[in-house]
Amino acid sequence: MSNYDKEIPPEKAELVDRRAFLEVAAGAVAGAAVSGAIPEIAAAQNSGSDRGSGPLYMQTNEIQNAIIHYRRDGGGALTEVERVLTGGAGSGTFKPISGQASAPNAFEGAGSVILSPNRQLLFTTNGGDNSVSSFRVGKDGRLTHADVKPTGNPVKGKSGTAKSLAYAPSKGILFVVHSFGPDHVRLMSVDAQGTLGMRPERYTVNTQEKTDRVPTMGVLSPNGKFLLVGTTFDQSIAHTGLYPDGSPILWVPQPDGKYRVIASNAPDPDGLVLFPVQDDGTLGGAKFQDAKAASPFYIAFLNGRPDAFVIGYAVGNGCAMATIDSDGKINVGPLVKIDTSPGLPSELCWLSISPDDRTVYATDFGYSYISSYHINGSGLKIAKDPACPKVPGDGTARGLNTTVTSGPSDCWITADGAYLYQIYGNASALVGYATRSDGSLHEINRVKIPYNSPQGLTGF
């Protein structure tokens, strides 16, 4: 009998020790740090005199959704420049992924606000009504609304779930990922002016046996040949229900009477989903690959190594280095776990990689702080855990580990690696940090943002 299929009498299900079980789930691969010398971070990251300025963009995800445009000065401080309506609807404080009336991280996703590589267009999802908006970006970073179009997926219930974007400019195609399927991935056409067009193609990350999977984000490989999609649940927590204490049910009965954790890739080797990108921008058949640990939430390619990427695991509680070859075969290295003493799972869900590919910053939703890794050759090593003090929320939000959280979600690092910005939704705060060569973060700026709803960060 598999460790993941232990028989549990239904009357005992509510007494399950979730920490013990999630330790099993997280152990789909044993974590191991790769030792070796850590090179010093470039001096540009430590000197304030040559740090540049630029725009930073975040979506409010309010019912009347808007993009907030901040101006980042040479010292990293943020000043709000404008709020531009998207023409679409967000989910507000409602969290569709769990059905909670008010909670941070509405969609369990990443990459909801992105820029085109030439920085002339900005795209954002509108999760409330399943639409996408485009903007033209001026030389000063100011936004001009270009278009808004539905993704093609109908809204069921109180909100849609469009949440992650990837853009292939050479093909004029935008890939849109939704939390709920079966049509998880939809395509939209884009022209040079940002005009959007709905397309009929639709793709799923479900399998024949798993018909309620929840993907997290879509990322194009640097060569544009593959769309990689991360996953977090094999069954949505909005559909599994709650324990009497209000925490989500993470173990569900199977037809054979056994119970299984709903975290993806725990242990079935199918948590990473790869779609070949065809010449016309449409996708080939899905290939399900082993992520080697539970809930491979975030995928971040290195800046200088187009065949290498880092995976952040929400239930695996750590990160791993991975490579992809020209045929799309993925090889995942050892999992390097963070300290999980605050509770399991950590919900390590978002990553930012420094431009010199030496440091990874990992956002821990369940712990209300950020951890950091150093990239050492082909592996990872913990740098600072935590890398910054915990940011408290208002006490109303809890992670899957039942601990109170401020709900940190998307983060973004500047092109010079000098500053990192982090959303703490339940604290109504966007926090700016100065990076340090040892992997630690020093808070330099904090601005008030809408409560619980904001998501998505990008800039230049």
Predicted regions and their residues:
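Short loop/turn segments immediately following beta-strands, especially the blade-tip
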Residues: 71-77, 136-142, 187-196, 275-282, ...
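N-terminal secretory signal peptides
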Residues: 1-20, 27-35
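Beta-propeller fold detector
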Residues: 79-88, 144-152, 197-206, 284-291, ...
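C-terminal segment of N-terminal export signals and the immediately downstream linker at the start
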Residues: 15, 36-53, 57
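Beta-rich, blade/repeat-based domains predominating
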Residues: 51, 88-115, 152-170, 206-226, ...
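Short loop/turn segments immediately following the C-termini of beta-strands
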Residues: 61-62, 72, 127, 179-180, ...
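Short, conserved, GDST-rich strand-edge loop motifs in beta-rich repeat architectures
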Residues: 54, 230-266
